[in-house]
């Protein structure tokens, strides 16, 4: 798949979709539901299906020294997955890792994504 990450450029989502990217990454500043709606509207006008989204978990929650814990990570993951919805979505970060993350927090993020995704599938 052809993927693109346009930081701070949610206005560009329709143009990126039209440019034949398969997956658009949404940064931490933009709402997943809004991104989904923008792509759906743009695709409908073109008579196409909307493309896939990924993102936008805030990696600051994974920093070793920020005071966040499992509860905050779980809450943020659940909110992210709820906003983006289960279809055509890749759970990912809204920007890159910088090397100062707590490995146990990164593991918590991955586990939460798996657990909450399994819950969504079971409820479908």
Language-model features, listed with the residues they occupy:
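Catalytic-face loop-and-helix region of soluble metabolic enzyme cores
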Residues: 1-124
């Amino acid at each position: 798949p052809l993927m693109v990450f346009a930081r701070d450029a949610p206005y560009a989502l329709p143009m990126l979709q039209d440019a034949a990217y398969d997956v658009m990454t949404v940064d931490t500043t933009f709402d997943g539901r809004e991104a989904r709606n923008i792509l759906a509207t743009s695709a409908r006008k073109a008579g196409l299906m909307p493309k896939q989204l990924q993102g936008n978990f805030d990696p600051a929650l994974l920093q070793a020294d920020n005071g966040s814990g499992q509860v905050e990570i779980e809450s943020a993951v659940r909110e992210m997955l709820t906003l983006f919805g289960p279809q055509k979505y890749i759970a990912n970060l809204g920007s890159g890792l910088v090397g100062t993350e707590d490995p146990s927090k990164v593991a918590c993020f991955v586990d939460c994504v798996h657990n909450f995704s399994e819950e969504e599938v079971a409820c479908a």
